[in-house]
Amino acid sequence: MLGWIGDIEKATLDNDTFRTVVYTAGHTQLTVMRLRAGEEIGWEAHGHLDQFLRIEEGTAEVDLGRGEDAVDETHPLQDDWAIIVPAGIWHNVRNTGDGDLKLYSLYSPPEHPDGTVHATKAEADAAEAAEHGH
């Protein structure tokens, strides 16, 4: 296939992993994510890429900050809401609902190795620590 074509809503809602890379192109990557009640992505910044996230199911909050040590803004999120996080902006998405939060993310350029599947946040954290030597 010359690109990815599919029902992104179905792919997102059917996902039962913390993070799965669905497709990686030369300049963009599509991932689907599930955060359990109370779970969060974690405070992070991507210095080299922009990130788009869209909520398909659930409620959440996003924190945004100019630096690692300060949250400058917090915004509520719900179904069909989206976030664009520019390169270098610190951010965290937190599931504030009682059920799963289902979302998808576009990274430009790609962030994760093609084919990445992290069943849980703990698995994702361990992989990141190994990759970055923490």
Can you describe what each PLM-predicted range is?
Residues 1-32, 42, 74-78, 119-134:
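A short, N-terminal "cap"/entry segment at the start of jelly-roll beta-barrel domains
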Residues 28, 37, 48, 89-90, ...:
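A generic "binding-loop/recognition-motif" signal
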Residues 30-34, 52, 74, 82-84, ...:
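Conserved hydrophobic/aromatic beta-strand scaffold that supports enzyme active sites
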Residues 32, 62-64, 103:
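Short hydrophobic/aromatic-rich beta-strand segments that constitute the beta-sheet cores
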Residues 40-42, 61, 81-83, 87-93:
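Histidine-centered metal-chelating micro-motifs
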Residues 48-61, 65-67:
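Glycine- and acidic-residue-biased ligand/ion/polar-headgroup-sensing regions
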Residues 67-87:
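Short acidic-glycine-tyrosine-enriched beta hairpin
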Residues 78-79, 87-113:
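Ligand-binding loop in jelly-roll beta-barrel domains
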